[in-house]
Amino acid sequence: GVVGIILSGGFVEDVFVQLRESTIRSHLGHIQVYRAGYSELGRRDPLAYLIEEPATIAQDIESLPNVEAVMARLSFSGLLNNGKADLPIIGEGIEPGKEAELGTAVSMVQGRMLGDEDAYGVVVGQGVAAALKLSTGDFVTLVSSTPDGAVNSLEFEVVGVFRTFSKDFDDRAVRIPLAGAQELL
């Protein structure tokens, strides 16, 4: 009985450790930096809370002792179109090289992760790929609103399909290079 309790306790502890690590490596990081007011009002208007001079802030943080890596992400929402249908998505602009360096809890089920050479590449969640019948090599159009309310769109090539620990995330998530997200928005 005691051995069973100890083993099940260890199993539960391991599940929590893996959940924490996959959340850190897939979505949030250990620490997030954002402008004052973002946590209260930024969910409604995230583009109003963009960080001024992000490269300078990243350099300052990276120079701190015990900091191993700093990377930027830009979250946005929009529509992904395969030429036949639209799907509402949540998007992240990422720094592909730094993502690869840090490691991630994203598992590729088709294709590959984004690389620095993929200026207009996109990786999509497994649910997104299924809903729009996407495979690597397909082209999609990503549509989003700019901060001043205009609608912008860019074409991307699907370079990979990923899976995370969260099916809900995979059903709506896409990742593009940070520069592409900045151009889109």
Language model segments and positions:
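Short beta-strand/turn micro-motifs at beta-sheet edges
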Residues: 21, 180-185
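Alpha-helical transmembrane segments of integral membrane proteins
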Residues: 1-4
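Hydrophobic, regular-secondary-structure patches
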Residues: 9-90, 112-113, 117-118
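Hydrophobic secondary-structure segments that place a key small or acidic residue at a functional site
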Residues: 73-76, 85-95, 107-179
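Residues that scaffold the ATP/ADP-binding catalytic core of kinase and kinase-like folds
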Residues: 101-102, 131-132, 184
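Cytochrome P450 core scaffold surrounding the K-helix E-X-X-R motif
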Residues: 98-106
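Short, charged/polar surface micro-motifs in flexible loops or helix N-caps
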Residues: 39, 96-98
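Extracytoplasmic/secreted envelope proteins and their assembly/folding machinery
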Residues: 55-58, 178, 182
